[in-house]
Structures are given as C-alpha cells and as structure tokens.
A protein has these predicted regions:
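Aromatic "clamp/platform" in nucleotide-sugar-dependent glycosyltransferases that forms part
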Residues: 286
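A short, histidine- and acid-enriched strand-loop-helix "catalytic/donor-clamping" loop
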Residues: 92, 106-127, 135-138, 142
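Nucleotide-activated donor-binding/catalytic signature segment of Leloir-type glycosyltransferases, i.e.
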Residues: 245-266
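Conserved donor-binding/catalytic core segment of Leloir-type glycosyltransferases
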Residues: 191-207, 213-216
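Conserved acidic donor-binding segment of nucleotide-sugar-dependent glycosyltransferases
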Residues: 319-320, 324-331, 339-346
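Short hydrophobic beta-strand element within catalytic cores of glycosyltransferases
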Residues: 303-307
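Donor nucleotide-sugar binding/catalytic pocket of nucleotide-sugar-dependent glycosyltransferases
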Residues: 134-183, 192
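Short alpha-helical donor nucleotide-sugar binding micro-motif in glycosyltransferases
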Residues: 263-266, 273-278
Length: 400
C-alpha cells in the first residue's frame, strides 16, 4: 500500500509520525511549502526515513492556490497512490487534494483533531462539513472526542481510527533523563530557576496566559502562608508572540515579574532542557483541538495540569494519577491546582512515571497503526463519488 500524506509543512511531529508509519506502509510525505506559517521551526531535514517532497518551496511568493492546483496535476498522477491522506478540511490545500482525489477516484483519508466543543458550532456550517467529511473513505482522529465529532459529521464509526496526535516519545524521555542527570549545569546554561511550573505555548489569546499569570500571583500569595519561600516555584513561559508585552506588563502589575521567566521560542533540540528541569507542566488554553505540548511533557516524565477545554485531556489526563484538569476561566481553581502539586510531599515522581506510562500508548506507533488500518479500510471502502451538491460545495469552499 502506498499513501500520500499531505501537510502544510513538516515539523518534528510530522517526521516522527511518518517515520513510524513508513515501517508499516509505503509513505510519501508531501508538504505545500518549506516553512510553516504558524511556527518558527527551522527546516527539519534530519532523521527523515520516508520519501518526502516539497511542492512549492520556501519562498512565499511561489505559493498561490493556482500554483498548488497546477502542481497537484503535474506531480500527483505518476505517483500511483492507493490513498491520499489530508489534514482536516478547513484549508485550501486539503480541499484541493480531496478534489483531485475525487477526479482520479483515489480514496481519501481525513485526519482530524476537531471536537464538537472546541469552537462555537453553527448548524449551516456543520451541514457543510458533513458534505465534505462524506467524501472521505476513512479517518484518523486524535482521540476519543475527535472520533465522536467525526461520527456526528457522518463518518461511520468502523472507518475511524485513533492516534493522529503523536510526538516522538523516545526523544523526549531519553533527553529529559539526560538533562536531569546534569540539572545544575543545564539550569545555569538556560538561566532557569531551581523549581518551576513550565508552560509552552504561542503567546496568543486562546492560550490563556494572562489568566495563568493571574493564577500564579494567587498561588504565590497562598504559598507564602503555607511553605518556606525556598519551596515556592517560579513560572517559565516558553514561547513568543503578539501578547508578549501584555504578559510582561501584567506580571509587573501583579508584582510577580521576578519569578516569571519568558525565554522566548526555542527550537526542538532545546526543548528537553526545559522539560527536564521542570517540576510540573501546565496548559491553560481556553480552547485547544489537542495540545501536543502535553504529549511532550508527559513523555518527559512530568505531572500535568491541563485545561478541560483541551482535546487531549479525556485521553491523556488520569485525574489524581498523572495530573489534574481544571476550568481555564477559573483563576482560583488554577491557583489551587498549582498549590496542590507544589506541596513539599506531593508525589511528583509517581505522577511523572504515570504520565510516561499513559503516553506510551499515544506515540508514533499508534499513529502508524492507525494510518495502516485507515489505509486498509479506505481501499476496501473505495473512493467516494461526490454528488453534484458536494462538488458545488467543494468548489465554493475552494474559492473563499
């Protein structure tokens, strides 16, 4: 079996997944462009064990919808694919591949990490989505809530497989362990405090970092009554973005800026330093389709505090075992969770071990198994035939 798997751009996550998948099926990885429009990843070319192609290069001037359509027609026909695999249904690239696959009658597999509750849902838009999802022969979903949403959109349950959202667990586990063996040296190198909560996110509104800073201020005030000052943890916010000045100003306003560290965006090789030196991980998003940083933290052996609005929470967070969930709009609740896990006798190591045990079932192998099963199913089901209405909807969406 040969599957063409499409992403906008390949970062570390995609490479780890497709490397694993290439051990089960023949994988052709295709990216629209050579750099991400969302993440400041450096080009990720090392450790690629599957055939990979960049369709339109790194120059944004080369990227246009017309160029992409021409490229698909020119490049795809000779590849003899048994199935195409697209990342959702919300962007032009995925819709273009679905349209191309319909034209040449090749089964389509839809990868999805959307849930019924990650965004406000409107009946008309949901009806349109059902028409597009109906063009898929199988699906690879992130986890349980993502599967449930695909079923709502009309995908037969027996055609849906799990495991889409995976990171290279071994990379984080091994490198975080190395960092812990030389923690003092790494802390000095990265300018890190002795004990801290770690958050890793783009500095954008949905990541809810202003409330996290407010919660940290409440936590710190409460902790001063409970613990010795040496037992109070700092907060490290890893990432960057448009809200940086607002976050810095809020930290100053609340009188906690000296304990909040913002080292900026860090490339993949640096991440284990921050996970390996942390005591616990916190992810406070008000909405999040999945939350791959939670995978990274768990693979690194950290307890996790995760917003109940994150798509990964139902499958990855076992309450009171490897972490806790919270209402991301409730500052007092977030602060209470921070206070709980930073208690001097809290079993951090046991929670961290539980994290690694849980995430072991949600790594690249699960992605590979899910993609293999989805490809087999898509081939058995065969390519969908679009109604005139579905073709018109697809064309209209591509003209937006």
């Amino acid at each position: 079996m040969k599957a063409g798997v499409f992403f906008e751009n390949f970062g570390p996550y995609h490479v780890a997944r497709l490397n694993a998948a290439s051990e089960r099926i023949q994988v052709l990885g295709l990216e629209w462009r050579g750099r991400s429009q969302t993440y400041a990843w450096e080009p990720f070319a090392f450790g690629v064990h599957f055939e990979k192609r960049t369709l339109l290069g790194r120059d944004d001037k080369c990227f246009s919808n017309d160029n992409l359509l021409r490229c698909l027609e020119k490049e795809m026909a000779p590849l003899s694919l048994n199935a195409v695999v697209v990342n959702g249904w919300g962007d032009f690239g995925s819709l273009a591949v679905i349209s191309w696959a319909l034209k040449y009658q090749i089964p389509t597999i839809i990868m999805s990490e959307s849930t019924a509750w990650d965004e406000p849902r409107k009946p008309v838009k949901e009806w349109i989505k059902r028409q597009v999802v109906g063009l898929g022969s199988a699906a690879l979903a992130g986890g349980t809530p993502h599967r449930d949403y695909l079923i709502q959109l009309g995908m037969p349950p027996e055609n849906i497989f799990l495991g889409y959202d995976a990171v290279d667990n071994d990379y984080f586990a091994k490198n975080a362990a190395v960092v812990r063996s030389q923690k003092s040296e790494v802390r000095r190198k990265q300018g890190l405090p002795e004990k801290y909560f770690l958050a890793s996110a783009r500095f954008v509104e949905k990541k809810n970092l202003p409330r996290l800073i407010e919660a940290y201020a409440v936590y710190r005030k409460s902790a001063e009554f409970e613990y010795a000052k040496t037992e109070i943890w700092d907060l490290v916010l890893l990432g960057d973005g448009a809200l940086r000045k607002e976050l810095e100003a809020r930290s100053l306003e609340l009188g906690v800026s000296q304990w909040i560290h913002m080292p900026g965006f860090r490339q993949y090789p640096d991440l284990p330093d921050y996970y390996g030196c942390a005591q616990a991980f916190i992810h406070p998003s008000t909405t999040e389709q999945w939350g791959l940083v939670v995978n990274e933290a768990m693979a690194s052996g950290l307890p996790v505090l995760v917003s109940n609005r994150c798509g990964c929470a139902p499958d990855l967070v076992a309450e009171g075992v490897n972490g806790f969930t919270f209402d991301p709009f409730n500052v007092q609740q977030i602060a209470g969770m921070m206070l709980k896990v930073s208690e001097p006798y809290f079993p951090l190591a046991a929670f961290g071990e539980a994290s690694q045990h849980i995430i072991a079932d949600w790594g690249p192998k699960r992605f590979a198994d899910g993609l293999f099963a989805a490809t087999e199913t898509a081939i058995k089901v065969g390519p969908r035939r679009a109604s005139l209405l579905q073709r018109l909807i697809l064309r209209g969406l591509m003209l937006r």
